[in-house]
Amino acid sequence: MKPTLKPSRVTIRAPTRSDCGAFLRAVRRSRALHDSWVSPPSTPKAFTRYLERFSSDTNLSFLIIHRSAGDIVGVINVGNLVRGALQSAYLGYYSFLPHAGRGLMRDGMLLVLRHAFRKLKLHRLEANIQPGNLRSIALVRKCGFVREGFSRRYLKICGRWADHERWAILAEDFGK
């Protein structure tokens, strides 16, 4: 299925220190949604570390912002960016309540993909997803990612090693 980018209900931007309060409130509101899938920063100190980690050339973060409400809808991180012959990065992402399940993360993901492929000139983006995370799998599938494989005990999530499916999208597949 060809992913299409329509006039978006969201914008993307880098997080700043001034986002800390709204971000932490969104994390608290969404604890049940994130349980066992992801551990977003949940304290001011953790938020500061997050900003420091994702302010380099190899790790970028984008807040997905609802255009009309101004709320933080979710986060998409572009991490471990490798240049040279690979031109690749890994994606990590999560949404916040009450916006989950409304297609806003899809809109945000398409904007991040466009930025990664057109502005950053990346060739490949990869998302590793726990097999039971059906919403996440549906998101990447709707954005044009292809399932490439399975990695046993791949990432330590919430204190335990978890299996993951490997999904990827190439620059030449985006926007065809």
Task: Identify the residue ranges that each predicted region occupies.
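Short helix-loop boundary/capping segments at the starts of domains
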Residues: 29-32, 56
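Residues at alpha-helix boundaries and short interhelical turns
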Residues: 38-41, 58, 99
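Conserved GNAT-fold acetyl-CoA-binding loop/helix
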Residues: 32-51
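A short helix-loop-beta-strand connector motif used in the catalytic cores of GNAT acetyltransferases and
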Residues: 52-63
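Acyl-donor (CoA/ACP) binding surface of acyl/acetyltransferases
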Residues: 1-22, 26-29, 61, 65-176
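A generic secondary-structure signal
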Residues: 50-53, 115
